[in-house]
Amino acid sequence: MSNFQAVYFRGKDGAQPVRDFIDGLDPKRRAALLRQIDRLNGLSDAVPHLPHPYSSQISGELRELRCHMGSDHYRILYRRSDRLIVLLHAFPKTTGKVPPGEIKIAEGRWEDFKGRMEARPRKPPRAAGHDAP
């Protein structure tokens, strides 16, 4: 079976908040986050999750992708949908635990994604996080 495919969540308005967050970083930090996302593209049924310290479970099927650059810590919250890994929310981490507000944003985007996929199934998006409904 083929590898999973990481895609950016795309809002109803066409916005891609995770991509926008990454694009707003300096080149070194952007490259580090993109390397972590590329690790997700290597996952498959045989290896469905990245090990700690790259990733960890947040709640239910919601997971966090971790990235450290010196004293800066970044998180991308994501969830799987069949063969897709949907990148839902990205933020700089400044506390010990992922704040509930950040989790709520990711869960809201997941419900939006899931609702639109069920309402109108589409062809899978392009690889490496180009787009998702």
Where in the sequence are the language-model features?
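Basic, Lys/Arg-enriched alpha-helical interface segments
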Residues: M1-H73, D82-I85, P92-P133
